[in-house]
């Protein structure tokens, strides 16, 4: 496995650009002007946080035992733990980047189970201990690219999804893998109020082709920065597909179902002209309302130090995954 390219940094990003995209998305989803005004104070709080004031705590989960295979270690500059845990999209807990860290503490994972079903010979139901006991954990330093044109580099901890799917023994009819997030309105304010939750249809669902799910880069993730995932990052287990935009990385997964048919996905249902099923990172295919040619890397500095850099095709993983899409029109199948 080739090591990843080093990311170069250039061109400072203005503060006004940093928060513009979210409001555009909400308007496209039909959220009212009154609702759009709700996160304004939170935006101000987040600006203060990026300047170094009142930062949320870094992940404080249980320490994990894991290896560090050389193939997944690299010289990429890491995004600090407090930013990984404090700057998130998890609309079930609110629309602003700071809302998940503020509100996700109510998420209870002690009775959590994950069901694997559908086109499999051996359906499974696993708890969190099963995941950490059955599969050796490893740290992988991955790029993470949001569709909103910002990026991080994160040391995730987990195991390849293909190892989990192999236990269930997919049948020859399995062509896709459908994922579903926990639906817990009593713990998730975004499920109680459509304005807090962005007007999306819940539970959040995502999907991959089976060959994408079986690729060795695709990671079932249970930790970050050496510890168990905090709730705002998708505890107890989330998906990481590093060559795709971040919204494909479904959080707090309770169901994995192998299917014959193309599964629905939340953002594609909400805005099919803007969010495709594949969602491969591609600097040559813009979002209808902003360019994807460059991205703002969130590193160790404050907001005035956030750097703009070129977006890499497949987020820098083209050597590993481009063959999955040979003959596929990436503009048509975005």
UniProtKB/Swiss-Prot annotation:
Entry's Gene Ontology molecular function annotations: metal ion binding; molybdopterin cofactor binding; oxidoreductase activity, acting on a sulfur group of donors, quinone or similar compound as acceptor
Cellular component, GO, one term: periplasmic space
Binding site for Mo-molybdopterin: 88, 91-92, 146, 181, 233, 238, 249-251
Needed cofactors: Mo-molybdopterin
Transit peptide recorded as keyword: no
PTM text: Predicted to be exported by the Tat system. The position of the signal peptide cleavage has not been experimentally proven.
Keywords annotated in UniProt: Metal-binding, Molybdenum, Oxidoreductase, Periplasm, Signal
A Pfam cross-reference name: Oxidored_molyb
Subcellular location: Periplasm
Annotated transmembrane regions: none
EC identifiers of the protein: 1.8.5.-
Cofactor note: Binds 1 Mo-molybdopterin (Mo-MPT) cofactor per subunit.
Enzymatic reactions: L-methionyl-[protein] + a quinone + H2O = L-methionyl-(S)-S-oxide-[protein] + a quinol; L-methionyl-[protein] + a quinone + H2O = L-methionyl-(R)-S-oxide-[protein] + a quinol
Keyword Metal-binding annotated: yes
Class of the enzyme per the UniProt entry, highest EC level: oxidoreductase
A GO biological process held by the record: protein repair
Main location per the UniProt record: periplasm
Signal peptide annotation: 1-44
Subunit and partners: Heterodimer of a catalytic subunit (MsrP) and a heme-binding subunit (MsrQ).
Function: Part of the MsrPQ system that repairs oxidized periplasmic proteins containing methionine sulfoxide residues (Met-O), using respiratory chain electrons. Thus protects these proteins from oxidative-stress damage caused by reactive species of oxygen and chlorine generated by the host defense mechanisms. MsrPQ is essential for the maintenance of envelope integrity under bleach stress, rescuing a wide series of structurally unrelated periplasmic proteins from methionine oxidation, including the primary periplasmic chaperone SurA and the lipoprotein Pal.
Family, per entry: Belongs to the MsrP family.
Protein name listed in UniProt: Protein-methionine-sulfoxide reductase catalytic subunit MsrP
Organism: Shigella dysenteriae serotype 1 (strain Sd197)
Lineage, uppermost ranks: Bacteria, Pseudomonadati, Pseudomonadota, Gammaproteobacteria, Enterobacterales
């Amino acid at each position: 496995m080739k090591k990843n390219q080093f990311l170069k940094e250039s061109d400072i990003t203005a503060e006004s650009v940093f928060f513009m995209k979210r409001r555009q998305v909400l308007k496209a989803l039909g959220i009212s002007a009154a609702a759009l005004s709700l996160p304004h104070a939170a935006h101000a709080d987040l600006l203060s946080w990026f300047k170094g004031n009142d930062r949320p705590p870094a992940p404080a989960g249980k320490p994990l035992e894991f290896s560090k295979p050389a193939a997944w270690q690299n010289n990429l500059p890491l995004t600090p733990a407090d930013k990984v845990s404090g700057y998130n999209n998890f609309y079930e807990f609110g629309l602003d980047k700071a809302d998940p860290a503020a509100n996700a503490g109510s998420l209870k994972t002690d009775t959590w189970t994950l069901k694997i079903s559908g086109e499999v010979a051996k359906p499974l139901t696993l708890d969190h201990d099963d995941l950490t006991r059955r599969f050796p954990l490893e740290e992988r330093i991955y790029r993470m690219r949001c569709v909103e044109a910002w990026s991080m580099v994160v040391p995730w901890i987990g195991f390849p999804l293909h190892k989990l799917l192999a236990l269930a023994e997919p049948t020859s009819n399995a062509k896709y893998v459908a994922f579903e997030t926990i639906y817990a309105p009593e713990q998730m304010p975004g499920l109680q109020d459509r304005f807090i939750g962005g007007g999306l249809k819940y539970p959040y669902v995502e999907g991959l082709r089976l060959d994408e799910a079986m690729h060795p880069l695709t990671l079932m993730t249970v930790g970050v920065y050496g510890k168990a995932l905090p709730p705002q990052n998708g505890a107890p287990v989330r998906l990481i597909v590093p060559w795709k935009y971040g919204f494909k990385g479904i959080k707090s997964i309770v169901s994995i179902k192998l299917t014959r048919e193309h599964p629905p996905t939340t953002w594609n249902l909400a805005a099919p002209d803007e969010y495709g099923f594949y969602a491969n990172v591609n600097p040559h295919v813009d979002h209808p309302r902003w360019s994807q040619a460059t991205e703002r890397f969130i590193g160790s500095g404050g907001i005035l130090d956030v750097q703009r850099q070129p977006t890499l095709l497949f987020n820098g993983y083209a050597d590993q995954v481009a063959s999955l899409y040979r003959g596929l029109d990436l503009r048509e199948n975005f």
